[in-house]
Structure formats: structure tokens, C-alpha cells
Amino acid sequence: MQVLIIGTGSMGRGIATRLIAGGNDVTLFDQSPDAARTLAAQLQGAVPGTNVAVAAGAADAVRESHVVILATPYDGTLEIARELRKALDDKVVVDISNPLNATFDALVTSPSTSAAETIRAMLPSSAKLVKAFNTTFAGTLVAGEVAVMPLDVLIAGDDDGAKSKVADLVRGGGMIPIDVGALERARQLEALGLLGITLQGRLGTGFMSGWKLVMPKGS
């Protein structure tokens, strides 16, 4: 699958690592072309034979991609949604953001909405927004596991076909996709993302922990 990742920070790196492991064609875009080129070179060095492309322009790269992952903080994601609105027409768009305040101890959204729903309202009606990866940490994505267990990736969205595409990407990267329901479930996912972040200092796990849904045998 042709996937564009916008944002080359730690989460962009982690998600790209998993998608490359799944054999997908990954293109990177960042406001800093040097940052995108550096990450592409590092990813190619880590996985011999891998070709990671670097996009010169975001809009053209969006049009050529099957899935667009917005691997940016909430404010940056809002800006991207505004700037690339037309290009994102009919695209599967993945929002990974947690709408954190400046001190990282609360959400800036009200309980009656979510970052994902806000972003969805900014996109064309044909765009299919999926919430995913906001409850996973970058280091665990690079490692591909937590405590020798595959990562659970919780997914929310209103379009089953779009969620299926994202689930295929997750599964191909050696992780477990869990469909939690409609996009409004992003409200709970973002609260869970916040809780995971605030627990890191208390537990001393250094952002290398993860949420795991333990299933009964035979499920």
C-alpha cells in the first residue's frame, strides 16, 4: 500500500518503521525537507533494500497515496487539515494526535467532542478519517513490541472500509488492530492516550509501556 506520513518526529519514525516492516511503500513529508531526508536515510539504513521516498510537496504526495497519516501534534494536524483540505478529498486520513494542553496533564477538547471529530469536520465529506496510534508510544513502535508482546493499536472511525485499510497496515506491521467503533469513540481513545502519558512519570516506564487487551483463550 502507498502510504504518506506527514511529520518526521518520533511518532512518524515509529509508524514508518512498522509500515516498512509490513512491506508498504512509504513516502515522508515534513516542513523541514532535511528532517525528512535524514529520517528516510536512517530507515533505509536500518532495513536494507528499503526505498523510502521523500515528497517535495505535500499536496501532490497526498494525491498519489492510498492512506495519509498525520503524524503531527494536534495544532499541527489542524493546520494540515486546513492547508490540504482539497487534496485530501476521498482519501483515508489517519489522525494520531492527542489534544494535550501545554503542561501535558489535560486535554484541550471538551468531553463532548474529540480532536478527531474536530479534524473530520474540517475535511471534505468524502474524506474518511480514522483515529489510530494515539495510544501507542514511538519507542514501542520502533521495537514492534512491549514485553515480548505485539502492540495493540486501537482504531476508531465511521467508514468500515477505511478502518479495514488501516487494520491491514497495523496487522502487516506485526501489531494487533482493535476496532473500538465509530469515530466518536476517539473521545475515549484520546483520554486513554492522556492517561498513558501521565502514567509514564509515575511508573517510570520511559514511554516503553503499552495498553494491552487480554483476551480469553479461543477468542
PLM feature spans:
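Rossmann-fold NAD(P)-binding glycine/threonine-rich loop
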Residues: 97-139, 143-145
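Rossmann-fold NAD(P)-dependent oxidoreductase module
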Residues: 14, 18, 122, 169
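General beta-strand structural signal in soluble alpha/beta enzymes
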Residues: 54, 128-132, 178-180
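Active-site-lining helix/loop region of Rossmann-like oxidoreductase modules
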Residues: 151-219
